[in-house]
Amino acid sequence: MEERQITIVDEKGNEHLCEIIFTFDADKFGKKSYVIFSPIGEVDEDGDPIYDAMAYEQNEEEGGVLLPIESEEEWEMVQETFNTIADEQEAE
């Protein structure tokens, strides 16, 4: 994914403009790509940014299709990757 923003539609049909934090590929749950994003202007109760993730497939016709993360183990892998990259960026 080359654009730095995406629009996510929630289960109620509301659109949320989100900043792409980073993307990565992983083979652990089949060859998948993942996107970590943060809804622009939305924060949690402590005022910290909200982060979320989805799998995605590149698609020439649509540009890309977002897919749900399917299992707790897959979420844990995404969370570990996010934490590792966040720690590396803090160290810089």
From Swiss-Prot:
<dbReference type="InterPro" id="IPR009711">
    <property type="entry name" value="UPF0473"/>
</dbReference>
<comment type="similarity">
    <text>Belongs to the UPF0473 family.</text>
</comment>
<dbReference type="Pfam" id="PF06949">
    <property type="entry name" value="DUF1292"/>
</dbReference>
<protein>
    <recommendedName>
        <fullName>UPF0473 protein BC_4380</fullName>
    </recommendedName>
</protein>
